[in-house]
Amino acid sequence: FLLWMEPERAYPGTDLAVAHPEWLHPLDDFYLLLRLDKDEVREYLFNMICSFIDTLDIKCFRQDFNMEPLQSWRTTDELDRAGICEIKHIMNLYRLWDDLRAKYPDLIIDNCASGGRRIDAESLQRAIPIWRTDAFCEANLDPDAIQAQMFGYNRLVPCSGGVCKRMGDTYATRSSYAPCYVGSWWWTDRPDRPAPTE
């Protein structure tokens, strides 16, 4: 069973944002980045994720990350400590994954992050990016762009996958092949079958 979460992000007005505003970067945005540079936030996320794993008997945990964090980190950094929030955030992310792997040795951590945005050497030691790019999610899927992105990528991350939302287009479908492949049967280019609204 796979659990798909985006634990580093919160919405304004949610229980977490109201109860712990000090755990959020003070950037007025639709999405708020959690202060993973703080140990108490890492501990909170660890306990929350563990509760889901234990309750739902999770075997694969997908951690997504669909936001641009740089401005949040820069807003929080002190003038003479530029970059420290980012460094601490990433170090605590690694520690979070290490703690999860120590507690659940057979847990698969799928590092989604908009597909392939966290494929540094340290992340690859702890997690696998099964979903290699969110470019597949675009209505105007460009098979050539996907092939260009994948040139050389499969040597570094051979077990990754994609989806093709244009069934019947052999070239687009084959451009999306990988060890993991998802077919989207409901979203096509046919005018008699519009894209789903959700």
Where are these regions (language model features)?
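Hydrophobic faces of well-ordered beta-strands that scaffold small-molecule active sites
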Residues: 1-5, 61-63, 110-111
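Active-site-adjacent "subsite" loops/lids of carbohydrate-active enzymes
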Residues: 2-55
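Active-site beta-loop-alpha junctions enriched in small/polar residues
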Residues: 6-10, 66-68, 112-116
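Histidine/acidic-residue-rich catalytic or RNA/ligand-binding cores of hydrolases
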Residues: 12-18, 71-76, 118-128, 195
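Active-site groove signature of glycoside hydrolases
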Residues: 30, 44-79
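Alpha-helix N-cap and loop-to-helix initiation/capping positions
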Residues: 40-41, 81-92
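Active-site-proximal substrate-binding groove within the catalytic cores of carbohydrate-active enzymes
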Residues: 93-198
